[in-house]
């Protein structure tokens, strides 16, 4: 039989940081994106230049948040990457979260996305600016066993 394709709610958002603030921000302080919609849900991205938790203060942390109340947790696959230029991803720092259930008003991510030292020496930081991309794919229960093609917004 021929493969069946289903549309999967998906999209991405870019958070551009202008003026790298690491020395001036305490651990646990975040830079947050404006809200954006993927799959009919409201999301945001957070970047913690000096880590989210004291034990990770030497790292940059990234997370995404479902910023609305929901009746049931949303099943989602998420990925983060640095964007050196719009539409050009660097695969060396791509991190993904496998399918997970996200309750409303909750965030998930990577407390140790990259060490601050490695980041500050990388090509991702240019003129004290960088961009993080967050890709979200909403997993719908009825698509099990069907080849699904993600349609980026």
Locate predicted features.
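Protein/peptide-recognition domains central to ubiquitin and immune signaling
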Residues: 1-153
């Amino acid at each position: 039989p021929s493969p069946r394709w289903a549309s999967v709610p998906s999209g991405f958002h870019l958070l551009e940081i202008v003026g790298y603030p690491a020395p001036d921000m305490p651990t646990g302080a975040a830079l947050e994106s404006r809200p954006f919609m993927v799959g009919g849900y409201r999301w945001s991205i957070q970047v913690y230049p000096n880590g989210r938790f004291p034990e990770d203060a030497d790292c940059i942390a990234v997370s995404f948040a479902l910023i609305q109340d929901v009746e049931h947790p949303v099943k989602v696959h998420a990925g983060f990457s640095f964007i050196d230029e719009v539409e050009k991803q660097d695969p060396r720092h791509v991190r993904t979260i496998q399918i997970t259930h996200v309750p409303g008003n909750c965030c998930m991510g990577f407390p140790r996305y990259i060490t601050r030292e490695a980041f500050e020496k990388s090509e991702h930081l240019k003129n004290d600016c960088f961009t993080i991309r967050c890709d979200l794919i909403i997993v719908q229960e009825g698509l099990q066993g069907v080849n699904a093609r993600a349609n980026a917004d």
